From Swiss-Prot:
GO terms for cellular component: cytoplasm. Keywords: ATP-binding, Cytoplasm, DNA damage, DNA repair, DNA replication, DNA-binding, Nucleotide-binding, SOS response. The RecF protein is involved in DNA metabolism; it is required for DNA replication and normal SOS inducibility. RecF binds preferentially to single-stranded, linear DNA. It also seems to bind ATP. Its main location: cytoplasm. This is DNA replication and repair protein RecF. It comes from Xanthomonas euvesicatoria pv. vesicatoria (strain 85-10) (Xanthomonas campestris pv. vesicatoria). ATP binds at G30, D31, N32, G33, A34, G35, K36, T37. The keyword Cytoplasm applies.
Length: 368
């Protein structure tokens, strides 16, 4: 899939601006603070229902404005069914978020997230490796959400059961009142974990060659999954039963896929705790690119890839390796930088450049 029009209204420093990117490589340059990141942020907002830079109170809506709007038009599908155009709109005002997809109102923003797939690498992406388990669970679930149509229904089933069980635990409910929710949690949780396990195994097969291509010195060799309970010893139903009294005392569910995690392994490093910040960023980027490749294989088309502030996140050597990998893929890529990365110097006709300044985006003449 590739975006053909991105229209942004009253978001951060932009009042009204429109971007028509090419279907290959796109570079947005400009001084720090010019608004380059906000362009990718708008796209991310549509694809994830949240910003990668913090909450709305952090200045997402333009100062003095009451709302923001983002519109995206993109092409998708290139198989037997042919290519089709899709359109989505997102509006935020006060505490309300509303969305439209292909001319129809959506009941939940998840419909927009399911329609438009964007893989984003930004300055905070290192938390995928160096942070807590939540971003790593979210990473797994994003991949499954986009390649397995029934995954969201199953995920919601588990989340609902977990919420109900935790509410009963906080109330000090009698054990018999937990039985039904334990059954629901165990059944949906086992299924959720099986999907995550298979996905991570598949992802590992893609990740190792990707990491070797963009950062061979890392020696990234494997991904290890921790399901959230001792699954090799007991079923989730038994784990919940064994932990029931402790959970009643603590007021929350201590076992299950909501506690799952995964960790990368390296040939020459003791583990992720030994990674420098730069190594954590490279590992995170390798994971994101492997996920994009898996999406492309399963769906028959690439997601949009957004790389924010590439020059400050990676040194010239690794920039070159990443860009070489991306240039060989039929993916639409949007990159922001203060100046043209050396790795794009020879991109030629594949590269479309834009300049961002004073809340405006100017398309520059194509390179020859």
């Amino acid at each position: 899939m590739h975006v053909v029009r991105l229209s942004i209204h009253r978001l951060r420093r932009f009042h009204t601006v429109e971007l028509h990117p090419s279907s290959t490589l796109n570079l947005l340059t400009g001084d720090n603070g010019a608004g380059k990141t906000s362009v990718l942020e708008a796209l991310h907002l549509m694809a994830y229902g949240r910003s990668f830079r913090g909450r709305v109170r952090d200045g997402l809506i333009q100062q003095g404005a009451n709302d923001l709007e983002v519109f995206v038009e993109w092409k998708e599908g290139n198989g037997a069914a042919g290519e089709r155009t899709r359109r989505a709109g997102l509006r935020h005002r006060g505490q309300e978020w509303t969305g439209r997809l292909d001319g129809e109102d959506v009941a939940q923003l998840g419909a927009l997230c399911a329609a438009l797939a964007v893989v984003t690498f930004e300055p905070g992406s290192h938390v995928l490796i160096s942070g807590g388990g939540e971003p790593r669970r979210r990473f797994l679930d994003w991949g499954l959400f986009h390649v397995e149509p029934d995954f969201l229904t199953m995920w919601r089933r588990y989340a609902r059961a977990l919420k109900q069980r935790n509410a009963l635990l906080k109330q000090g409910a009698q054990p018999r009142m937990l039985d039904a929710w334990d059954h629901e949690l165990a059944e949906s949780g086992e299924s959720l974990t099986s999907r995550r396990t298979r996905y991570l195994e598949r992802l590992q097969e893609r990740l190792v060659p990707v990491a070797d291509a963009i950062a061979p010195a890392l020696g990234l060799s494997a991904l290890t999954f921790a399901p959230g309970w001792k699954r090799h010893e007991v079923s989730l139903a038994d784990a919940l039963l064994l932990a029931r009294e402790r959970d009643r005392q603590n007021g929350y569910t201590s076992q299950g896929p909501h506690r799952a995690d995964w960790v990368p392994s390296f040939q020459a490093l003791p583990g992720r705790d030994a990674l420098s910040r730069g190594q954590a960023k490279l590992t995170a980027l390798a994971c994101l690119l492997a996920q994009a490749e898996d999406f492309a294989y399963e769906r028959g088309e690439w997601p949009v890839i957004a790389l924010d502030d590439l020059g400050s996140e990676l040194d010239r050597h690794h920039q070159g390796r990443v860009l070489q990998r991306l240039a060989s893929a039929p993916a639409q890529v949007l990159i922001t930088a203060t100046e043209t990365p050396p790795g794009l110097a020879d991109a030629g006709a594949l590269l479309q450049q834009f300049h961002v300044e004073h809340g405006h985006i100017t398309r520059q003449a194509a390179a020859h």
